């Protein structure tokens, strides 16, 4: 049995938190934790370039990395060949992601600054919605477009109004999270952090 030690870092507000009424934290999983959640040796997210990044900043970098996006497209080709994606090409996919990413993160930071965090997150599912008034819940946000589809997700735990812990994010390629490897891993990360925090 491996003893994990999930680390959490503050990403907002930057600097003095004395008068802040909103907080965004982000999980920094270590390699063993990520492997236990379904990642495979050799995946880009486990490389030296990304392993020391918290989940929020890792997403920002991954969604701008053409090599990662090329691999992502190839690894998920069966999903992109579905009618839902309208025969999207790899070039179009990479272009849409790399052009959307800066706008997504700029919008998120603007919402942080404007105190509108609660407007961008919604309960992950019915179960979380039912628990919302009483306890911490799992949440998601939806941003950006790929081939006219809202496909970017950021997952978090809502501790209370204005306080979130980001556990990861994904380019969602299918409707249900458990149907694709990347979103299954994100669900595992979210559930693991929720069990530790919630």
PLM features: residue spans?
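Active-site beta-strand-loop-beta-strand hairpin of nuclease catalytic cores
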Residues: 158-166
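Short acidic loop-to-beta-strand element that houses the catalytic metal-binding Asp/Glu
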Residues: 153-156
């Amino acid at each position: 049995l491996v003893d994990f030690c999930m680390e959490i870092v503050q990403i907002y507000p930057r600097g003095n938190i004395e008068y802040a009424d909103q907080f965004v934290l982000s999980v920094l999983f270590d390699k063993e934790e990520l492997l236990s959640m379904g990642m495979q040796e050799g995946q880009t997210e486990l490389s030296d370039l990304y392993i020391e990044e918290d989940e929020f900043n890792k997403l920002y970098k991954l969604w701008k990395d053409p090599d990662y996006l090329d691999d992502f497209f190839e690894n998920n080709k069966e999903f992109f060949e579905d009618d839902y994606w309208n025969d999207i090409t790899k070039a179009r996919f990479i272009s849409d992601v790399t052009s959307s990413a800066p706008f997504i993160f700029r919008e998120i930071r603007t919402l942080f600054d404007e105190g509108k965090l609660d407007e961008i997150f919604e309960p992950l599912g019915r179960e979380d919605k039912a628990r919302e008034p009483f306890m911490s819940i799992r949440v998601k946000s939806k941003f950006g477009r790929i081939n006219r589809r809202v496909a970017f997700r950021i997952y978090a735990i809502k501790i209370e109004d204005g306080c979130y812990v980001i556990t990861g994010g994904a380019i969602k390629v299918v409707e249900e999270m458990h149907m694709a490897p990347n979103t299954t891993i994100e669900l595992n990360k979210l559930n693991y952090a929720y069990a530790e925090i919630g």
